[in-house]
Amino acid sequence: MHKYTIVIEKAEGNYSAYCPDLPGCIATGPTVEGTIQRMKEAIEFHIQGLKKERLAIPEPSAKAVSIEVAA
């Protein structure tokens, strides 16, 4: 089992997400929770495709941090 970092962004009317370790693996949803669920499904599908093509499955390496700056 792998634990991938995803980035979720607020869009106009919904949310979008991507996984930095899996280029092209994206999802959208009406809520944060819905987007997370769809992203999980997208990652699983993406990895299945890599396996089918006998390609290497990238190890999770992306890290996310929040920083505070003066505004």
Please describe what each predicted stretch is:
Residues 1-5, 37-71:
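Short, charged, surface-exposed hinge/linker loops at domain edges
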Residues 7-22:
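Short aromatic-glycine-(Arg/Gly/Cys) micro-motifs in beta-strand/loop hairpins
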Residues 16, 28, 51-53:
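Extended rod-forming repeat segments used as scaffolds/tethers
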Residues 21-24, 59-61:
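Hydrophobic residues in alpha-helical membrane-spanning segments
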Residues 23-32:
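A short, exposed loop/beta-hairpin motif centered on an aromatic-Gly-Thr core
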